[in-house]
Each structure stands twice: as structure tokens, then as C-alpha cells.
Regions:
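Bacterial Sec-dependent N-terminal signal peptides
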Residues: 1-26
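Pepsin/retropepsin-fold aspartyl endopeptidases
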Residues: 20-399
């Protein structure tokens, strides 16, 4: 009888301990707050509208995981009659360092939902406005991203904001586990001359595929030395910066592989990439091929391939970067030896038509140059005189 009681006691304890071991505290389910539409600019950059404080006019904001805060354009602040505090903090970006002032304890309205207690730093975004051809009033980064879970659907062009909490991720995707210290950092695998690990910044605000620092490229020696590099112009915090365009064999993010990927290389004078900790960044020309869930609290990013996953990359190289100046599409700096220089184009030329198509918007002109190889007819104006030239656009994947 004693043995029977002992056996029953042991069985009870085993069952109790097993059940207790399965108990855990979990966060409540996340709740949907608001859905907002967005548009995409060159390179997949996300832009959406929001209201500041009680002002009635909507502002255009870029969603940027590469931003450690939230910011407003200095011209926008002036037009609203607001006065930021004196410069108090230094921020660093590609091409420059700036000391900035703040507008503190402000609110942002996304549809009917309000985000309060935001401290906006103030900076000049004129170069972004001219690059995209539409007014850029600010950039939304960590200050907002850290408060919510965001679902970004590139097919519907919508962003869903959720409260923090448990969330079931969709099937058929992959969960990345970044290290997030204001900015999300991850590791991928790249291959060309040889295979190499690549620590990168997950940057939805960058309208490109991959950006390497030249220090990383030189020290890793992963890129084939025979790869030809093409000089182009990029944009950063300090204005316009020179970059080189080339192609690498493959990029692997989790289980997803991209082949013959166009990449950019720049001289990181201000060590924005924190080399050797990071080698560069991966931008939204890659991540727009997924529907993305950002969960900063759990340090998780979920990717699900969407219908853009197999979209071809842009291999066209003309040497032209267009900017909107006083309502006109104007060429930026023309790189030496580029097709644009060989065609006789100069910085400041006004581009009126491509292949006899007049009346195109800035983004349409850019798309026309990026989607065409071979001979392209350009009609332009220089100092009031109409001129015509033929430019031979290069396919860099064939070089």
C-alpha cells in the first residue's frame, strides 16, 4: 500500500512539473491602429502623408530605417512659422556631418491616429526634393518605428501600424533577427571573386540595391578586380557625392538569393558605415521585393517574397542624374567618360524629351533612361537654345 501511494505521488509530481514547465508569460496580442497608403519613388523609397500638430496641410515623409530619429525639412519649418531650438546635437550621414536644432514635444497625425511627444531635428532636405521631384518635408525613423509594429505591403502600397505585442507572422516567409541599436544591423552573404560575409545596415530609406564602403571592398577582396566601375552621382546628408556602379555575382539574405546584383561603392570619408563593424547597407531596391514586418521591440524583421521578387534589376548606365530645379528636369554633374559626356551633355542642361517623348515628369524621365539600352535620342535646352543628341546607354551587366 505504501508503495502504491509513493508511486501515485511520483506520478502526480511528474505531471505537475511537466505542466508547470509549459507555463510562460506572454505579451497581449498586438492591435491594429491605422492603415496608411504610400507611393514609391526611384529605388522603391516609401513616401506617405501625415499632419504635423494642428496644421491642416499634409506633409510628405520618407519612411527610413536608416534614420535614428525623426526630422523635418528646414524650409518646411520656416513656411509653417515654427522656430526650432538652437543647434544642440550632431548627426552624421553619407557625405557630411551637421549640427541640428529641434522642435520638441510635437505630434504627428496618421489618418485618425495621433503619435505624440516627438522631437523632430531640423535639416535641409532641398537635395531630396530636387532628386525626387516632389517636396520632401521630413523623414520618419527610429522615433516612430520603435513604438509600433509595422506591416509594409508593397503590392497594395499600404503600411499597417500595430501596437506592440504578440504577432503571428505569415507563412512562406523568413524571420531575420537584427541587432537594433536605433538602427537595424544584419549579416548577409555576398559572392563575386570569392564568398564573403557582409555586415550591413537594413536601410529602407536608401533607393538602391547595395552600397559598399570602398574600405570594405578593398579589404575583403571579394569583388573581381576586372570588374569595370562606372562613376555616378549619389545623394547624402552633405549633398551630392560621387559613387561607383558595378555588378557582383550574388547576394544572399536568409534563404533568398539574388544574382548579378548592381552595387554602389563610395568613399566613406565620415565613416557612416562604421567600418570595420559594417561594410555598408542594403537598400529598398532589394527589400521592396518582399512584404516586410518591422518589429523593433522583439528585434525581428519578417520578409515574405511578393510579386516584385523576380523583377529585373536596372543595369542601364548613362551617367545622367536628373534633378527638378524650378519645375525643370536638369542634369547634375556629368561623370568623365560617361555616355552622357560622350554625347556632349553638360551639367545644368534642361532635359525636355527622350526618344521624342515630351511632357514627361521627372520620375518618367528617369525611368526612360533606366529601362533603355543602346541609342537614346535626347532633346535638351542649354542657355535658351534647343539641342539634340544621341546617347549610347550602357548595359553594365554585359561588361
Amino acid at each position: 500500500m505504501l508503495r502504491l501511494r509513493l508511486l501515485c505521488t511520483l506520478l502526480f509530481l511528474c505531471c505537475f512539473l511537466k505542466t508547470a514547465a509549459q507555463e510562460e508569460f506572454i505579451d497581449p496580442p498586438s492591435k491594429h491602429l491605422v492603415t496608411i497608403p504610400f507611393v514609391q519613388f526611384t529605388g522603391g523609397v516609401i513616401v506617405f502623408k501625415a499632419l504635423l500638430d494642428n496644421f491642416k496641410d499634409s506633409l510628405n515623409f520618407i519612411l527610413d530605417t536608416g534614420s535614428g530619429g525623426i526630422s523635418l525639412d528646414s524650409a518646411t519649418v520656416e513656411s509653417l512659422g515654427l522656430k526650432p531650438g538652437p543647434p544642440e546635437r550632431i548627426i552624421r550621414g553619407i557625405g557630411g556631418v551637421r549640427k541640428v536644432g529641434f522642435l520638441k514635444k510635437r505630434s504627428l497625425h496618421l489618418g485618425e491616429y495621433e503619435i505624440d511627444s516627438l522631437d523632430f531635428h531640423i535639416i535641409d532636405y532641398e537635395v531630396l526634393t530636387s532628386l525626387y521631384g516632389q517636396k520632401i518635408d521630413g523623414i520618419i525613423g527610429y522615433s516612430v518605428l520603435s513604438r509600433y509594429i509595422l506591416k509594409i505591403n508593397y503590392e497594395k502600397q499600404e503600411i499597417d501600424f500595430y501596437t506592440k505585442g504578440t504577432m503571428k507572422y505569415p507563412k512562406g516567409g523568413y524571420l531575420l533577427r537584427p541587432y537594433i541599436r536605433m538602427l537595424p544591423y544584419l549579416k548577409s552573404t555576398i559572392s563575386d571573386n570569392r564568398k564573403s560575409g557582409f555586415n550591413y545596415l537594413f536601410d529602407l530609406g536608401a533607393g538602391l540595391t547595395v552600397l559598399f564602403s570602398d574600405d570594405f571592398v578593398n579589404d575583403s577582396a571579394f569583388l573581381k578586380t576586372k570588374r569595370k566601375r562606372y562613376l555616378k552621382q549619389g545623394e547624402g546628408l552633405g549633398g551630392r557625392v560621387d559613387m561607383y556602379l558595378t555588378v557582383m555575382k550574388s547576394l544572399r539574405i536568409g534563404p533568398y538569393r539574388f544574382r548579378n546584383v548592381p552595387v554602389n561603392i563610395f568613399n566613406d570619408d565620415y565613416n557612416v558605415t562604421s567600418y570595420p563593424s559594417l561594410g555598408g547597407l542594403i537598400g529598398n531596391e532589394i527589400f521592396r521585393r518582399f512584404n516586410v514586418i518591422l518589429n523593433y521591440e522583439k528585434q525581428q524583421i519578417h520578409l515574405t517574397p511578393n510579386r516584385f521578387f523576380t523583377s529585373p534589376f536596372d543595369y542601364a548606365y548613362s551617367g545622367i542624374e536628373l534633378y527638378l530645379v524650378d519645375g525643370v528636369a536638369v542634369t547634375g554633374k556629368i561623370p568623365a567618360g560617361s555616355p552622357a559626356e560622350k554625347a556632349g551633355l553638360n551639367e545644368g542642361d534642361e532635359i525636355l524629351a527622350i526618344n521624342n517623348r515630351f511632357g514627361m515628369q521627372l520620375d518618367d524621365l528617369k525611368q526612360a533612361l533606366q529601362s533603355t539600352y543602346g541609342k537614346v535620342k535626347i532633346i535638351y535646352r542649354r542657355k535658351g537654345v534647343l539641342l539634340t543628341t544621341v546617347m549610347n546607354v550602357i548595359n553594365i551587366s554585359k561588361k
